Amino acid sequence: MLEQQTCAEKAANTVNTVELSTDQAKKINLMNLTRQQMREFFKELGEKPFRADQLVKWIYHFGEDNFDNMTNINKKLRDKLKQVAEIKAPEVAVEQRSADGTIKWAMQVGDQQVETVYIPEADRATLCVSSQVGCALACTFCSTAQQGFNRNLTVSEIIGQVWRASKIIGNFGVTGVRPITNVVMMGMGEPLLNVANVVPAMEIMLDDFAYGLSKRRVTLSTSGVVPALDKLSEMIDVALAISLHAPNDELRDEIVPINKKYNIKMLMDSVNRYLSVSNANHGKVTIEYVMLDHVNDGVEHAHQLAQVLKNTPCKINLIPWNPFPEAPYAKSSNSRIDRFQKTLMEYGFTVIVRKTRGDDIDAACGQLAGDVIDRTKRTAQKKQFGQEIAVRNH
C-alpha cells in the first residue's frame, strides 16, 4: 500500500520542523516548503501568513537567497528569518555546453552529483530535472540505471535545480522573460518512487507566486509504478509521459524490469484511469519508445505496439538510442526508425521522432549518469548482463 501524507499532515510536520529548528538552532531550508507550508511556517513565527507569498516571490521570481535583499520585508523579520531559516539550492559542480546550445549541469547534492539539462529551442526552453540520486529500476538501455541507486532527492534538491538554472540563465523577475517554459521530470531517477518530494516540487513549479508554469508544461515521466500513478491524480494534475519501450511483456520484462511487477496491461489501464480525470494532457498521454537496433524496432514490433495502444489516446515519441560505455546495444538505423514510424502512422497514430540534443556532452536521453554512490550493487550486475547480451547477439 502506497503511503502518502495529506496536506494537513505535511503542514503539521512543517510546524514541528519549525519548532525543532528554533529549539535546536537547526535552520529550515525554505525551498523544502510549498507556499501553503510556508504560510504555516510564518504563523508559527507569529507573523502574518501573507509574508510567505512575498518570500516565495523573492525566491523564485527573483532568484534571491539573501534575506537582507528582500526590501519589502521589515528588518526585524529579516533578522528573525536569518536565525531560523535558510534558502539553499544545489550548487553547480560542472557545466558543459553543447554545440547545439544544450547545457548540462552536474549539481552537487551532499557528497554526490545529479545532472540537469537545459534545452533551448526557438519557441520554448525546457529543463530536464532529476528526482533521485541514481535509479533502482535497472532499465538496461539507460546510463543512469547502470549507476545504481543511492537515495531520493529532497524537495529543495528538486526545485533547487530549477532555481539554479533560472539564476544562471536569467530570472523572470530580473529580465521579464521566462528562462524556463517547460519542465520535464525525465532526468536521473524514477519520479513515482519519490512522490513525497516530487509532488511538492511540482506544486512550486505550478504556483503563480513561484514559477507559474501551466500544468501542461510540467511533465512527469514514469516507467510504470502503477500504485503511485493511481495515487498521482489525487495529488496533482500534470502532463504524463510513459517510458514504454517494448510492445510485449516478454521483451519489456528484459529491458524494463519493473514490468515483471506491473505488466503492460496493468500500466495502460492505470494510464487510462489517469487520463479520465486529468485536464493537463489534452486527453492524450505521451508514449516514449527508445529505438534499439534489432531488439524492439522491427515492423512486427510496430504492429504489436499499435495493438497495445489502440484503446489509449496518445502521441508516440520514438527516441533514437544514445550510446554510453559498455552498453550492449546499437542505435537503430534511420531506415528502420522511418519504417517503424510509418507503420504506426498507418494506424492513425501521431508519431514523432525525437531530435537528439546534447549528445556531444552526454546530455541526451538515457545518457545522464551523475556521480552516484551505489547502494544496489547494480554496477556489478550490469557487467554480467552485458556479457549475456553479447553472447546472445553473437
UniProtKB/Swiss-Prot annotation:
One of its GO terms (molecular function) is rRNA binding. [4Fe-4S] cluster binds at residues 135, 139, 142. It is found in: Cytoplasm. Residues 121-360 form the Radical SAM core domain. It catalyses: adenosine(2503) in 23S rRNA + 2 reduced [2Fe-2S]-[ferredoxin] + 2 S-adenosyl-L-methionine = 2-methyladenosine(2503) in 23S rRNA + 5'-deoxyadenosine + L-methionine + 2 oxidized [2Fe-2S]-[ferredoxin] + S-adenosyl-L-homocysteine; adenosine(37) in tRNA + 2 reduced [2Fe-2S]-[ferredoxin] + 2 S-adenosyl-L-methionine = 2-methyladenosine(37) in tRNA + 5'-deoxyadenosine + L-methionine + 2 oxidized [2Fe-2S]-[ferredoxin] + S-adenosyl-L-homocysteine. Binds 1 [4Fe-4S] cluster. The cluster is coordinated with 3 cysteines and an exchangeable S-adenosyl-L-methionine. Keywords: 4Fe-4S, Cytoplasm, Disulfide bond, Iron, Iron-sulfur, Metal-binding, Methyltransferase, rRNA processing, S-adenosyl-L-methionine, Transferase, tRNA processing. Disulfide bonds join 128-365. S-adenosyl-L-methionine binds at residues 189-190, 221, 243-245, 322. Specifically methylates position 2 of adenine 2503 in 23S rRNA and position 2 of adenine 37 in tRNAs. m2A2503 modification seems to play a crucial role in the proofreading step occurring at the peptidyl transferase center and thus would serve to optimize ribosomal fidelity. Belongs to the radical SAM superfamily. RlmN family. This is Dual-specificity RNA methyltransferase RlmN. It comes from Pasteurella multocida (strain Pm70). The gene is rlmN.
